Amino acid sequence: MANRIKKGDQVVINTGKDKGKQGEVVRVDGDRVIVSNANLIKRHTKPNPQAGVAGGVVEREASIHISNVNIVNPATGKGERVGFKVLEDGRKLRVFRSSGEALDA
């Protein structure tokens, strides 16, 4: 099945410590997404001179389950659910469920 959320989509987070935050999808891994500047975690890394990596505390984005984000509708500015509409030529088109407005051109 095709994913309702793709890389580059503007999304809003529904649950968790970052509830209400908006950001762009950086990566989609199956049923998990990474959203820019959301769900930040700290990783303690060892220095590795061979790879040129300095040690220390690194802050980066962690993944969020795909069910915990909604795509932002540019017309309303709110997060809304997305469904699919099958065109006559067999292609699938992502549409907002509330308005039926097409998400992809």
From Swiss-Prot:
Listed InterPro entries: KOW, Rib_uL2_dom2, Ribosomal_uL24, Ribosomal_uL24_KOW, Translation_prot_SH3-like_sf
Report the SMART domains cross-referenced here. KOW (SM00739)
Q: Among the record's GO biological process terms, what is one?
A: translation
Which UniProt key words apply to this protein? Ribonucleoprotein, Ribosomal protein, RNA-binding, rRNA-binding
- The domain of life for this entry's organism is Bacteria
Matches recorded under Pfam families: KOW (PF00467), ribosomal_L24 (PF17136)
Q: Is-annotated flag, keyword Cytoplasm?
A: no
One GO MF term: structural constituent of ribosome
A Gene Ontology cellular component where this protein is annotated is:
ribonucleoprotein complex
Which Gene3D superfamilies does this UniProt record tie to the protein? 2.30.30.30
Q: What does this protein do?
A: One of two assembly initiator proteins, it binds directly to the 5'-end of the 23S rRNA, where it nucleates assembly of the 50S subunit.
Family assignment?
Belongs to the universal ribosomal protein uL24 family.
| Subunit field text | Part of the 50S ribosomal subunit.
Name of protein: Large ribosomal subunit protein uL24
